[in-house]
């Protein structure tokens, strides 16, 4: 995990520039998320520089957005202009919150890059209310086009920490096998296929 954090610390300053190429796809994702978080207490894991939280905060009641990278959170705080949005450094595997604390948990583009993502899902299950919603968009690299495979190859050379290489179907099956009912899914065409998933607990 230390190497994982070091990669994001090194790349925090250029992260937003890297993501600009997928701006239109992210706008579609924000549109999907806003009605789900409307007037809700939200927890975002792996927020990075806070792109998603900043774009949906007007809809939410409050967002606690966290990341394991100190430098990513420093970038996020620099651009934060909302009193409803709070950024902090946290470990998604050991969250300092009581059980059933949040209406919505967002974990975007993170489950494929952490070891043992099922443990992250178990911790999300713990802090999410029984009638809450998990929003888990994830790049599903096994469905890459040829150009996507080339990009992924060079990202790997640069140290990008890819741990799980799913197709969209494999990813949704992984969620179902780990205690979640997928109530909505959409594959968005970004630099890599982005599988947007909204989930509810199957066991409460």
What are these regions (language model features)?
Residues 1-37, 51, 55, 75, ...:
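Conserved class I S-adenosyl-L-methionine
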Residues 93-104:
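A short acidic, Gly/Pro-enriched loop at the edge of an enzyme's catalytic core
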Residues 104-116:
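A short SAM/SAH-binding and catalytic strip from SAM-dependent methyltransferases
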Residues 197-204:
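C-terminal lobe and adjacent flexible extensions of AdoMet/dcAdoMet transferase-like proteins
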Residues 40, 61, 103:
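Conserved acidic residues
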Residues 43, 47-94:
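Class I SAM-dependent methyltransferase SAM/SAH-binding core
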């Amino acid at each position: 995990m230390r190497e994982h954090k070091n990669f994001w610390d090194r790349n925090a300053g250029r992260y937003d520039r890297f993501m600009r190429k997928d701006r239109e796809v992210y706008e579609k994702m924000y549109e999907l998320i806003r009605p789900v978080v409307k007037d809700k207490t939200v927890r975002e894991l792996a927020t990075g520089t806070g792109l998603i939280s900043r774009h949906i905060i007007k809809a939410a009641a409050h967002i606690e957005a966290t990341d394991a990278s100190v430098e990513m959170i420093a970038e996020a705080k620099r651009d934060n202009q909302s009193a409803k949005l709070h950024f902090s450094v946290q470990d998604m595997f050991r969250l300092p919150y009581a059980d059933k604390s949040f209406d919505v948990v967002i974990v975007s583009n993170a489950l494929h890059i952490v070891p043992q993502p099922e443990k992250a899902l178990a911790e999300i299950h713990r802090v999410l209310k029984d009638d809450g919603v998990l929003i888990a968009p994830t790049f599903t690299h096994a469905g890459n086009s040829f150009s996507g495979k080339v990009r992924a190859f060079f990202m790997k050379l640069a140290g990008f920490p890819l741990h799980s290489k799913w197709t969209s179907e494999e990813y949704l099956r992984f969620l179902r096998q780990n205690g979640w009912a997928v109530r909505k899914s959409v594959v968005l065409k970004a630099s890599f296929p982005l599988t947007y998933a909204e989930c509810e607990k199957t066991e409460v």
